[in-house]
Amino acid sequence: MPGHKGRFGAPALQKATALDITEITGADSLFEASGILAESEKNASSLYGTAYTFYSCGGSTLCIQTMLLLMKQQGRRVLAARNVHRAFLNACVLLDIPVQWIYPRKSDGILSGTYDLADFEAALQAQTRPACVYV
């Protein structure tokens, strides 16, 4: 798996590496999809009601960086949960993007905290300009 260097934390997931066919000849190209991947991107666009869908050639890090750059160019505010991916934090620092953090509620379970949709809705409604939410 690109980005994971063929390693997975759980031994049960080791078999999943055999399912990564993106690098096999004839399986289409993530960089310039024209076959099955292009068809899948078109289907995803239809499913999510978007004009276009493009699968990432650079994994989740590239997708996160792209989303944040687009939001910054549009002057939109970024709201985020506190348990974000490291790539999100790094991109915010590099792009000089301030983040409005949504803090978790205390949990008595095994998780250190939980999030409630109402907290995100309230934060969005308080915005004067459209915002994006990273969860």
What do these predicted regions represent?
Residues 1-17:
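N-terminal glycine-rich, Lys/His-bearing helix-loop that initiates the first secondary-structure elements
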Residues 14-62, 83:
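Conserved N-terminal alpha-helix of the aminotransferase class I/II PLP-enzyme fold
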Residues 24-25, 101-103, 130-135:
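Short beta-strands and strand-loop turn motifs
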Residues 81-82, 101-106:
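Short beta->alpha connector loops at strand-helix junctions that form conserved
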Residues 95-97:
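Short, structured coil segments at secondary-structure junctions
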